Amino acid sequence: LQGMAHPEHYLAVCCILKDEDPFLEEWFTYHRLIGVEHFFVYDNMSARPLDENPFIRKLIDAGGLTLNSIAGRAMQLPAYAHCLQNYGPRCKWLAFIDLDEFLCPLETDDLRRLLSEYEEFSCLALNWKCFGSSGFISRPSGLVLRNYQERFIKAHPLHFHVKSLVQPEKTANVNTAHAFFPCRGEKAVNEHFRPLPFGASLAPISWDRACVNHYLLKSQQDVERRIHRGRSDVLSSKPTVDYADFQRLLAEKQEKDTAALRFLPALEERLARGNSPDMITAEDAFPQPPDESELETYTRLSGLCAQDRRFSEAELLLCRASLRHAGRAELWTFRANLSRMQGRRGPALRFLRKALSLNEIPQCYEELLDLFIQGGHVSEGRAVLTFLLHASTVRTDDAGFNHKLAVAKELLARSSRGRESA
C-alpha cells in the first residue's frame, strides 16, 4: 500500500459482526470516546441488517461509519483483507477487533496520544485481557464494562494473544485475525517497543500502557448465543467457546479489574444523551486549523494549547498534522517539546531520534539540549552545547539563539558546580 494519498483519519476500526444489536451502542460510543474517528463495519448476515438499526444509521449519516455486507462463513479474514486494501489508504492507524473486544488505553484517555509514539512501526500489538462471566447465567441489563469486572489471572495462556493496530502504509497483508504481515523492512512491536516475530499472533503479556479488554464469556446465555451463531474466522464446527470451555473457565481463578471503569461516567452520559448526529460529528473531533496544509499552523495552535496546559488538545493537533507532515523533522521536534513540558523524557527522546533521522535541523539539537538540562544530565548537555557552538548549520547572528546558548552554559555550569560541592 505504498504511495497512498494523505489519510483522512488518524485512528479507525475495522470489525465484522453478526446479530450484535444489544451491544452496538455501548461498543461504538465507547470507542468514539477513546479517540476512534471512523468505523469500517462488515455485516455478516445479521438477522436484522445493520443498515436498519437506527443507531448505525445515525453513524452512517454523520459520516462516522462505512458499512459493507459480506455473506458466507469464515469471512473475517476476507473482510479484513478487503478493508486493508480498500480503506487502508484513508487511515493512519487501523485497528482490527471484534464486538466483544474493547481497546483500553491505560496511560491516557485518548488512544491517539499513545499511538503517536509508535508511528515509525508498522503495528502496535496489544495483549488480550480476558474477562469471565461474573456469575451471570442470563444476560444482565446495563453495560458490559460495568457488569463484567472479573478477569482471569494475568499469567493465563489466553493473555498471550494480541490484537493488532496497524499502519496500512507499512502493512502488506493479513495473516490471522490477530496479526498482520508488515511490509519489507517494517516492524511490529508491543507496547514497550519490543519487536515481534514476523506475523506473530502471540507476545509476552504486558498491560502497562494499553490492552484489549476481551469479554470472552459474558453470561451463559451469551455463550449459548455464540455457539448457535458459529465462528467468523475459520470454517470450523467448534465455536470459540463451547459448553465444556465455559464450565472449565468458570472454575478458574479470577481477579477484580476496574481499569476500564474510569470511562463509565463519560460513556453513560453520552449514551443518556442519545448519541445525536450532531454529537457524533462534533464531539471529540480534532480542533481544525484554518489551513490543513501548513505545519506551522498546527504547531502554533498546539503551542497555544500547551501554554494553557491543554496537552491532550495540543498532542491531538499534532496527530492531525502527521497525516500530512510525518516526514518533517519540525513535527517530531515539536512533539518532543510537548513531551518534555509534561516531564515525559522517554517519548521526548524517541521523538528527537525520529526528527534527527529525517533532518538534522538546529531546533532538534536545541530541544535535546533543553531536555538534558531539565533532566540534570550535565555531560550530555555539555556535549550538545559544544556541538551547537561549532555546527555550521547554526546561525551565530541570531540574537535569540545566542541568548539561549548563554543561558544553557550558565545552567550547565551551575549543575556542574552543584555536583562537585555535593
Predicted segments with their positions:
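Short coil turns that delineate tetratricopeptide repeat
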Residues: 292, 326, 359-360, 393-396
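Active-site-proximal specificity loops/subdomain of glycosyltransferases
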Residues: 47-96
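N-proximal low-complexity "stem/linker" segments adjacent to membrane-targeting elements
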Residues: 1-29
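Register position in tetratricopeptide repeats
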Residues: 307, 341, 374-375, 411-414
